[in-house]
Design a protein with these regions (language model features):
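Structural motif corresponding to the intra-repeat A-B loop/turn of tetratricopeptide repeats
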Residues: 77, 81-84, 119, 153, ...
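Canonical tetratricopeptide repeat
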Residues: 69, 110-111, 145, 178-179, ...
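TPR alpha-solenoid repeat register
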Residues: 66, 107-108, 142, 175-176, ...
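Residue-level recognition of tetratricopeptide repeat
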Residues: 72, 79, 114, 148, ...
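N-terminal leader/linker segments that initiate helical-solenoid repeat arrays
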Residues: 2-103, 107, 127, 413-414, ...
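TPR-repeat structural position
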Residues: 46, 80, 87, 122, ...
């Protein structure tokens, strides 16, 4: 289960920090929210921010700053609820802010940048973040939105500079988590772990602690340490037993340890409460592994419905489309989507998806260049290594194929409930 959406999740931290500032400005008279559940605190904070902004705009309808705050809150609400209709509300509020203050409106451009990242329009996100930076050159959140966009566009050096600026301005959870992702993409797992640990130590709220525990668990899982991954997920679940991301981690551990029934029970609850494309996809794959093909097909149908809703709300995720199509045995759709995404951005995840789609289409001579490009950063990514190994095997480069497949299984023997067994079988055939 490739952690392909981590940067979208990382964007949450900058949004949460901005919303915390917003909530303080708008709701000074409110009682503090209870700290019993990290997710509940975030939901409560965002809803209070929205309500306070709406109340103020009834009194002062021309307040550009409050329109920007409302728009940013709607972006966060879309993430929390999984309801993409909030994107249009966010767009409207942020555009209204710019109508009232068209020049030097840093908060509106910052919100539009976060919105564009959420919609996977990373070029627009970069442009909006740069406008926000012009108005707010010493605001850390600006560099978080900019770093996310640059990372996804494949502009690694520029993204690293933005993260460093963020660290210089405000060395807290949003900066440390982005630094961790940068280290991970370069293959420095120890540095990534240290950065996430610093983020955890700096966490000012239960929600931030949950976030850090989840990503420490993901880092451990992606590098084959199931015990450490499970420990991180479970420590987070002690804070909030219903946190969806941490429950997804628990489900992955169960599947990796061979307890498909437990994993599917967890996913059944997850997709009912949070029917995100990621969870629907992962559930469908596991259902297929369990032999429940009709149930898997229904999950894929629900996934297609969710993707149509996202597209209607202005969100385009051709990378996810390609990955899902490949998993469903549709190389034509997988390749078309991967090519469209590659034309938009040259990120290693997109290079890998394009390589795999080309392989499935029987075009291995073209595929290997993209697989090599995905591997060139040094990222210890078992999926990258597996795809590259299978392409090399198809090209008859057996020694290199065996090395790549062995690397995939050494990095994470449980990287996929489908592809890890396929890697073992292919490797056995090469020996």
């Amino acid at each position: 289960m490739n952690r392909r959406k981590i940067i979208a999740v990382l964007a949450i931290t900058a949004g949460a920090a901005l919303l915390a500032t917003t909530a303080t400005a708008l709701s000074r008279g409110d009682d503090p929210a209870p700290a019993a559940s990290g997710a509940a605190v975030v939901r409560s904070d965002v809803q209070r921010t929205i309500s306070a902004a709406q109340d103020r705009l009834k009194r002062v309808p021309g307040d550009a700053a409050t329109w920007a705050q409302l728009g940013s809150a709607y972006v966060e609400q879309a993430r929390i609820t999984g309801d993409p209709t909030y994107y249009a509300k966010a767009q409207g509020a942020l555009d209204t802010s710019l109508q009232h203050k068209p020049e030097s409106n840093g908060p509106a451009h910052l919100g539009l940048g976060a919105l564009a990242n959420a919609r996977h329009d990373f070029a627009a996100a970069r442009d909006q973040a740069e406008l926000a930076r012009d108005a707010l050159p010493d605001t850390a959140e600006v560099y978080g939105v900019l770093a996310d966009a640059l990372t996804q566009l494949g502009e690694a050096d520029e993204a690293r500079a933005a993260v460093q600026r963020m660290l210089d301005l405000e060395p807290g959870v949003p900066a440390f988590t982005r630094a961790a992702y940068d280290f991970e993409q370069r293959g420095d797992v120890d540095a990534a772990r240290q950065a996430l640990t610093r983020a955890l130590d700096a966490s000012p709220s239960p929600a931030d602690s949950l976030f850090c525990r989840y990503h420490l668990g993901e880092l451990a899982f992606d590098n084959g340490d199931l015990d450490e991954a499970a420990a991180q997920y479970e420590q987070g679940l002690q804070i909030d037993p219903l946190d969806p991301a941490l429950l997804q981690g628990r489900a992955k551990i169960a599947a990796a340890r061979g307890d498909l029934a437990d994993a599917l029970t967890i996913y059944a609850d997850l997709v009912t409460r949070v029917p995100s494309p990621q969870y629907l996809h992962e559930n469908a794959v596991l259902l297929g592994v369990a032999g429940r093909t009709e149930d898997a097909a229904r999950q894929f149908d629900l996934l297609a419905q969710q993707e149509r809703l996202l597209a209607a709300a202005g969100s385009t995720d051709e990378l996810a489309t390609s990955i899902v199509a490949a998993d469903r045995g549709d190389p034509t759709t997988a390749l078309a989507a991967a090519e469209r995404e590659w034309n938009r951005r040259q990120h290693p995840l997109v290079a890998d998806a394009l390589a795999w789609a080309l392989h499935l289409a029987g075009r291995d001579a073209e595929a290997i260049g993209h697989a090599d490009r995905a591997a060139a950063t040094g990222w210890r990514n078992a999926t990258f290594a597996f795809h590259r190994g299978m392409i090399l095997r198809a090209l008859g480069r057996t020694a290199e194929a065996a090395d790549a497949l062995g690397s995939a299984l050494k990095t994470n023997p449980h990287f996929s409930p489908v592809d890890a067994p396929a890697a073992r079988s292919a490797l056995d055939g090469l020996r």
